[in-house]
Design a protein with these regions (language model features):
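Sparse, context-dependent recognition of short Cys/His-centered cofactor- or disulfide-binding micro-motifs
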Residues: 2, 58, 75, 150, ...
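Active-site beta->alpha N-cap acidic-glycine motif
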Residues: 14-93, 97-98, 108, 116, ...
């Protein structure tokens, strides 16, 4: 009888292991340098189709020119971040000018969408911690650089990203190229199939 109970317990435990829900791994898709008058909208269509949230780090000079695309990003529920006004290395500027590069974008985003932004991606990944304290902005870098701006080879972009992907990674892309739109769609599908859950960067860095 004791042996029978032991076997039953083992079978129940094994069944529980097989039926348990697999844990999802969070990953964030981010886009720099937008908005683009054509490819931002194409990217938004892909994200809507795949039901995936993303984070867009906008350049002020582009956001000013393509305000409708900024509103579309916000209306679809994506997170908007700051990428300075002119894509400049903030540490190369006088403090006041560096501050204005960031504040001007935040002000414009709030004007266009009704909400400001707390997140900044410094161009070239170079940041000044003093700006973080003074402007109360949270810098967001990346862990996977797709290098999508260097090639139109969609396969190369996809394979590099999927091979490097891990839990809580932040993927850097640019919504300025047709090849990036195509690659993003395939990356999303591949990583979903591997059990990844796409989230906005705030859910990764605050995890």
């Amino acid at each position: 009888m004791e042996k029978f109970l032991t076997v039953c317990a083992a079978l129940i435990l094994t069944a529980g292991m097989w039926s348990a829900e697999p844990e999802t791994r969070k990953i964030a898709l981010t886009f720099d340098d937008g908005p683009h008058p054509v490819y931002t909208e194409e990217m938004l269509k892909v994200l809507e189709q795949e039901q995936v949230p993303a984070t867009f780090f906008l350049l002020g000079e582009n956001a000013e020119q393509y305000g409708e695309q900024v509103r579309m990003i916000a209306e679809q529920g994506h997170l908007i971040g700051n990428h300075t006004w002119r894509h400049v290395q903030v540490t190369s500027l006088p403090k006041e000018e560096a501050e204005e590069e960031i504040l001007a974008v935040s002000s414009l985003v709030e004007e266009l969408t009704g909400n400001g932004t707390s997140y900044v991606r410094p161009p070239f990944g170079i940041w000044d911690p003093e700006l973080e304290e003074k402007l109360d902005m949270i810098p967001v870098l990346w862990t996977i650089d797709t290098l999508d701006w260097t090639t139109q080879n969609v396969d190369r972009i996809v394979e590099k990203t999927v091979q490097d992907a891990g839990e809580n990674d932040i993927i850097l892309m640019h919504d300025s190229y047709e090849s990036t739109v195509q690659a993003a769609e395939r990356i999303i599908r591949r990583l979903k199939a591997e059990g990844f859950e796409f989230v906005t960067v705030d859910q990764v860095i605050m995890d």
